[in-house]
Structures are given as structure tokens and as C-alpha cells.
Amino acid sequence: MASNKIIGIDLGTTNSAVAVMEGNEPKIITNPEGSRTTPSVVSFKNGETQVGEVAKRQAITNPNTISSIKSHMGEAGYTVEVDGKKYTPQEISAMILQYLKKYAEDYIGDTVTQAVITVPAYFNDAQRQATKDAGKIAGLDVKRIINEPTASSLAYGLDKKDKDEKILVYDLGGGTFDVSILELGDGVFQVLSTNGDTHLGGDDFDQKIMDWLIDGFKEEHGVDLSQDKMALQRLKDAAEKAKKDLSGVQEAQISLPFISAGENGPLHLEKTLSRAQFNQLTNDLVERTKQPVLNALKDADLTFDDIDEVILNGGSTRIPAVQEMVKELTGKEPNHSINPDEAVALGAAIQGGVLTGDVKDVVLLDVTPLSLGIETMGGVFTKLIDRNTTIPTSKSQIFSTAADNQPAVDIHVLQGERPMAADNKTLGNFQLTDIPAAPRGVPQIKVTFDIDKNGIVNVSAEDQGTHKKQNITIKSNSGLSDEEIERMKKDAEEHAEADKKKKEEVDLKNEVDQELFQVDKTLKEVKGKVPEDDIKKAESARDELKKAKESGNLDEMKAKKDALNKVIQDLSVKLYQQAQGAQGGAANGQPGDSQQNGNDNGNDDNTVDGDFKDVTPDDKK
């Protein structure tokens, strides 16, 4: 019989860890080699699959070794080929998860089938789906996907449930950097904002040392070690060791005998790297982490004075220069009470305990990293869920058709921060068909966005008249890449003014279209009920607005629109006065037949015109 325990897994880019609740405390489970973390590396050799330290030791010398597969999670079409067989990132990740699962089972003494797995805060919908799929392949029922900084805060906050605090989590791992602002209070953990750099981590610090060693050796001996795979493997191991040593000592000795051979025999590499030199080599990497911290604070609408605690997470935060920079930037001494390599897995185990009921009075509220919405009339991106909204969440809005007798609508689902649909990322498209024939603006189509506890998106559209419904779950091949998230955030900042102007232009054109449509409808209704001169005056004002629209001159469009509005208002007043006169002349004071104001089209004021494509029966499949 399988254990009911839910293990917590930190599936990292460079290293992974697994933990489980024992009593009221989370505990890291050591791997068969006695280490508390396991390298996220898989190698294939002689038909055998190897995971962890043994695979890492052959990362460069064995071409069938795969590292940092996490950076490709959710990437559509990406595969690695080994001995003629192609593997997806989910399959490689599943091999790492299976290894963690196996030694967790050995420790617990029972079969494990359930897990909570962590992901970087910036992982999008596709990447979260891919992580869940990897768990399924590994034989795990993934009960929850949670953000890494959130998990580490959960580990930190377990003993501080009676405190109300705002926490900044600085998470510098092997391959990614995340910063999150969280609020703790009454056992509730709420993420206020997230930010980061998805291509920055400890591997970059190792590479700086490797480049320094390679350049120095080439200058001294005229030999380029970057062309020698065996030498590169030794350099990589030595660079990582030197980096770790420099967290505790001022100088690191790097000794690699027989690293290469020259005309006069074997060549040896002997170097001393001081902490000051290391800081100089890696200063640009440390500086790159500052802006995401400032961005996260800005998104949370906070200052450093509002922050109560600063937590360091990820093995790379052991670097003294990183700790010093965080202290200077925030003005606060970072909290070192949690092992930065283990905090995420511990937090995941606590979340597992919450789900099984072993841990009580703790609620975890995560957020969605980017805004979600659909394309509406004029190519506008209409947001339904803003970024940094707490999940799980659901939001609905009523939309309508853009043409008379429109039989179907296309729902274009988007993710991003720009006002225009074309500048954001398409997540998916689906169609709602068999809409009864009706004038534009009459059908009421309810679009609903649901984001579940794992951050996975479901979108539905329902015709409120027929209750016909269509929906889509965003699949993993339609998500954003890390670069796209960063590009979209930067684009949103750089093009803010131009975007605002473009959106105002589209909004005005949409208003003009709606005005012209409504005026034509009103003029038909009042014909014969008001003087012909008034009708002609309104038609003339309408034609002037049409000309202004064709010219594209925004100022002229505004002026002509206002002029037409005034004419129609005057027309409505006369119609109303005539109706009152008819009412007064009715027998025994009975009301006469009053005409509705021509500007009432029977729509809710909050209804948004959708840019829904007209689909003829021939187009339907």
C-alpha cells in the first residue's frame, strides 16, 4: 500500500532536492551518496541511464549527458537526441524526478505517489504544465505546483505564524534568478509581486572563472584548453570548487596537473584566485540582480523601509559579494537562518503537509506573473486578469458581436502587458458557433478566465441567450519562453507612451463606429415622428463624421463626433417633448405610446464590442 505522504521536490536547473514532513518539521532526504542535494544531470552510457553526481562527473566528456534541461521546459518542439532516440525536456526531467522519488521511498519505507513540485516564479503556463507532465511521467500525482520563493518563505515562516511581515526573497540559483515580495500574516502567505532574470545563476559565475583560467593558460603556454573536452571537464569542476572555497577563505588554490601537453612534455595549471579577483570577474553578474529587486518593489508599491525581512535563497547567495550587495541595496542584514540550498524543498514539503492536513493554519496565496485577456475590436488587448493577481482566481466579462447577424465568434486568448493584441503573446484560439442571428451588439457572450492553484489557465465563452459554451485549456506548447517574458516586460516600459496614443486612437475609432451605427438606427426609428429638416441636419452631421473617420484625423473625428452627439441629443429632446404632448392629450389621462430614446440599444453599458470575425457557414468545419 502506498504512503499517504506528499513529498516536496525542488526541481532545480543545477541541483534538485527532496523533503518530507516528519512530525511537525520538514526534513531533507539525503541521496544514496549522502548528499542533501542532487545534480540535475542525466547521462546515457552503454544503455544505462545515470542521474546525479555520477552523471555530472561526465558532463563534458560524455556527449550523451544532459544538463540544465529545466531551461527548456515548456519549449514547443524542443528535444535532445541520444543514440538515435529523441527525448523531450519532460522526459529528461522525469528521470531526475524518478531518482528523487526512489531514494525518498527508500527513506520512508513505502511507495510514494504524491508530490508538490516547485518552479521559478517566472515560469509561465506552458512551463508549469510541462513540469506537471514530468511528474506524471515519473509516476507522481503532482498535487500542487508552487513558486520557489514562495516555498522558501513557507519554510521561513513556519515558526513565525503570529507575525505580520513583508518579506523580500532574493533567490539566486544555479541557472535562474528570482526576487519576490511576500506578505505574512495570520498564517497566510501572499505573494505581492515577482521579478527576475531567467538566464542568470551560479553557472555564470563558474564560467567567469573558467574563462579566466583558459585565457591565462593560453597566454602562458599558447595552448587553448577550450578545445580539449577532458580539460574542460576538469576546469569546470575546479572553477565550481574555487567559487565555493572563496565563500569561506580569501584565496583559492587551483591545481590541475597534466592538464595538457606541449612540445617539451606535460603542462600543469597552477593558479591562485583571490576573493578580490573573483569579485572583480563577477561584478557585472552581481550588478544584474539589482534592477529586478527594484522592479519587484515598484510592482508591490513598497519601499525598502516597508520590508521587514530579507531572505537569501539558492546556493549562489553564499557568495560574499552577493550578500554584501543585498545588504547595501536593502539596508537590511539578510536572514541566514535557512540553508539556501534546502529552503525550497523544505517549503514544498510543508505545502505537502498542508494538503494532507498535517500542517494547519497555513494558507499559501500565489500570483500569476503576466496579465491575461482577449483581443477585442480594433486589435485592442482587453485584460481580464492583471499580472500579480492572487491565484486561484476567476474573472468574467460580457462581450458582444461586431457585425449584424454574426453566426460565430473567434476568441483570441493572449498573455502580456502591452495595450495592443499584436504586441502580446498568443496563448490560444477557439470558436463559439451557432449564435442566433441578431443585430451587432445584441448577443451577450460571457468570456471567463479561470486560473487554478497551479497557475494553469482555462478560458470559456458562453452565449447567454442559448447557453452554448466552448472552452480551451492552454496547452504546454503555447506558452511563453523566458526571453519573451523579459522582452514583453521591457517593451511595455519602453513603448508605454506610444502604446497609450495608439490605444486612444483605436478607442476613438471604435466609439465613432458605434456612434454611426447607433445614429443610423435612431434615424430609422424617428423618421416621420420629427420634422424632416431635423432628420436632414442629423444626416449631414453623420456624413461629416464619416468623412472625418476616412481622413484619419483624430482631432477632426473628436469634433465631428461631438457635433453629431449634440444634433442627436436635440432630436431626442424634441421626440420626448412630442411624446409628452401625446400623453397629455390621451383620453382620461391614459399614457400615450412614448418612443424610447434613440441612444438606447438595449445593451449593458459595460458591454465591450469584440473584434469577432464573421464566419460564414462554409467556413465552419
Swiss-Prot record:
Residues 476-508, 521-559, 578-621 are annotated as: Disordered. The modification Phosphothreonine is found at T176. Induction: By stress conditions e.g. heat shock. Signal peptide: none annotated. The keyword Nucleus does not apply. The keyword Nucleotide-binding applies. Keywords: ATP-binding, Chaperone, Nucleotide-binding, Phosphoprotein, Stress response. GO terms for molecular function: ATP binding; ATP-dependent protein folding chaperone; unfolded protein binding. Residues 486-508, 610-621 have a biased composition (Basic and acidic residues). Gene3D superfamilies: 1.20.1270.10, 3.30.420.40, Actin, Chain A, domain 4 (3.90.640.10), Substrate Binding Domain Of DNAk, Chain A, domain 1 (2.60.34.10). Residues 588-601 have a biased composition (Low complexity). PROSITE patterns: HSP70_1 (PS00297), HSP70_2 (PS00329), HSP70_3 (PS01036). It comes from the Bacteria. Belongs to the heat shock protein 70 family. Acts as a chaperone. This is Chaperone protein DnaK. It comes from Limosilactobacillus reuteri (strain DSM 20016).
